């Protein structure tokens, strides 16, 4: 190996941003060149290559185990030629699973999941590294502006502070807000959102975000699509860099999340950003998926292994705090009976609220607000207020209300109430939800409401 140059110094080259190239040859010297979708750093002396359609390459290596790779730094475009010797093939185990996750992440960006299927992980020993002057250096461009990484000691101190803040949180709403704000204030992750698993176990919904023009609270993601869904489905972190080269992430993949079908279903847009790098980390508690913590950046290849480790710890802390608050809400003491004011007339044009019974989609003055469990909860609250002027409610009575069709999924109610509260605040509608105690909340109505229920046949 080249003296003074180690594989660890080439880490950016192995993040899948720029395709690498491998050259092999038959025993008689006939060459074959193939592009690589993924090169994985194994240790200081070895790399692993994804083998999904390497028939010619595999045949050549059986005859001649030596090969040459060209890898490129996605920021400086410096090139490095690696002379390697084939050592072994792995078809299971930790290395295989890690490489499969990387390959699936690349595939989901281009919609080629059925094509990019890992057959094996081929491990090579690197015997020589030859640096080649990059395009930026040849043009005389200044070095790229690479965001500095947190040093381990600082990261540990700030993670300790995040844990302290989460421990002091008084309810689930504070937990999710502390999570995304703490990532920005303590760990310098300016763009982040937290998505929780829904009751079906097949979708995620955004409950909190930070650093975006639009909060995107209530937007949904399928666990079958995209890097965030992949992180949830595999319960393992997904890290992507130079995403615009992969699939114009901000336009292509995000639009697939937000696609509106011909049935007329409404969706809330995800938090928007011109994304170039992403880390999606599963938030796990007691061996179960609670949600996914997502951090994004407008910088190319902004995140590395250290960021992934930091965010994995953060996601674990957040998941534990969420589950703890959910358990506390389940055993909360019911609120005492309260006397609600008689319904009055406020004057002016009433606010129109239409609820479509098919999926509980709610429209306020013609603008889409929310649907599903949160939509049914809002319908029940507005019906009670319309009938008797009630404004004070408890979580317990909602759990016992069969008309809400609440799912079996444990502690889903509190999450949906927070989702509804945040969505009402974001849209600035004339009725809001405010917590008045553990397991209690109030519906504040500042306008006359004209509630209309629309059956499936009418919609």
Regions found by a protein language model. Name each.
Residues 169-207, 215, 325:
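Helix-loop-beta substructure at the N-terminus of cytosolic sensory domains
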Residues 215, 273-276, 290, 296-312:
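Regulatory loop-to-helix N-cap segments in sensory/regulatory domains
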Residues 329-375, 379, 431-434, 438-440, ...:
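Short boundary/linker motifs that mark transitions into or out of structured domains
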Residues 370-378, 406-427:
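DNA-recognition element of transcription regulators
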Residues 367-400, 420:
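Short amphipathic alpha-helical recognition elements used for nucleic-acid or partner binding
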Residues 29, 136-174:
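Signal-transmission linkers at sensory-effector interfaces
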Residues 207, 214-271:
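Regulatory sensory and allosteric helical modules in signal-transduction proteins
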Residues 266-267, 276-284:
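A short, aliphatic-rich beta-strand micro-motif
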């Amino acid at each position: 190996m080249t003296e003074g140059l180690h594989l660890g110094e080439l880490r950016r080259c192995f993040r899948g941003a720029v395709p690498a190239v491998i050259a092999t040859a038959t025993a008689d010297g006939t060459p074959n060149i193939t592009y690589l979708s993924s090169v994985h750093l194994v240790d200081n002396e070895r790399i692993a290559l994804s083998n999904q359609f390497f028939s010619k390459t595999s045949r050549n290596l059986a005859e001649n185990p030596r090969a040459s790779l060209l890898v490129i730094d996605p920021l400086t475009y410096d090139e490095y030629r690696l002379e390697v010797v084939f050592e072994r093939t792995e078809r299971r185990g930790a290395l295989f699973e890690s490489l499969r996750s990387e390959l699936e992440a690349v595939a989901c960006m281009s919609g080629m999941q059925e094509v990019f299927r890992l057959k094996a992980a081929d491990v090579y020993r690197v015997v020589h590294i030859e640096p080649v002057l990059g395009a930026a250096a040849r043009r005389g461009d200044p070095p790229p502006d690479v965001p500095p990484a947190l040093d381990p000691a600082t990261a540990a101190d700030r993670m300790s502070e995040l844990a302290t803040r989460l421990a002091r949180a008084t309810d689930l709403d504070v937990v999710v807000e502390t999570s995304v704000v703490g990532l920005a204030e303590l760990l310098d992750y300016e763009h982040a959102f937290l998505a929780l698993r829904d009751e079906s176990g097949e979708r995620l919904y955004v409950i909190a975000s930070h650093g975006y023009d639009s909060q995107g609270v209530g937007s949904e993601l399928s666990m079958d699509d995209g890097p965030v869904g992949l992180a949830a489905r595999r319960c393992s972190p997904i890290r992507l860099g130079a995403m615009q080269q992969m699939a114009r992430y901000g336009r292509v993949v995000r639009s697939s999340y937000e696609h509106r079908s011909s049935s007329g279903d409404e969706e809330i847009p995800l938090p928007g950003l011109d994304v170039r790098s992403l880390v999606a980390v599963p938030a796990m508690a007691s061996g179960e998926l609670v949600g996914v913590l997502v951090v994004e950046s407008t910088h190319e290849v902004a995140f590395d292994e250290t960021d992934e480790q930091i965010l994995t710890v953060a996601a674990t802390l957040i998941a534990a705090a969420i589950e703890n608050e959910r358990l506390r809400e389940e055993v909360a003491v019911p609120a005492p009976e309260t006397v609600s004011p008689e319904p009055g007339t406020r004057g002016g044009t009433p606010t129109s609220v239409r609820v479509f019974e098919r999926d509980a989609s709610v429209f306020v003055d013609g603008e889409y607000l929310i649907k599903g469990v949160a939509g049914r909860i809002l319908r029940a609250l507005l019906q009670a207020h319309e009938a008797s002027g009630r404004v004070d409610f408890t979580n317990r009575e909602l759990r016992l209300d069969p008309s809400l069709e609440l799912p079996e999924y444990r502690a889903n109610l509190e999450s949906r109430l927070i989702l509804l509260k945040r969505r009402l605040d974001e849209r600035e509608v004339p009725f809001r939800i405010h917590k008045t105690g553990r397991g209690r909340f109030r519906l504040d109505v500042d306008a006359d409401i004209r509630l209309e229920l629309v059956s499936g046949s009418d919609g």
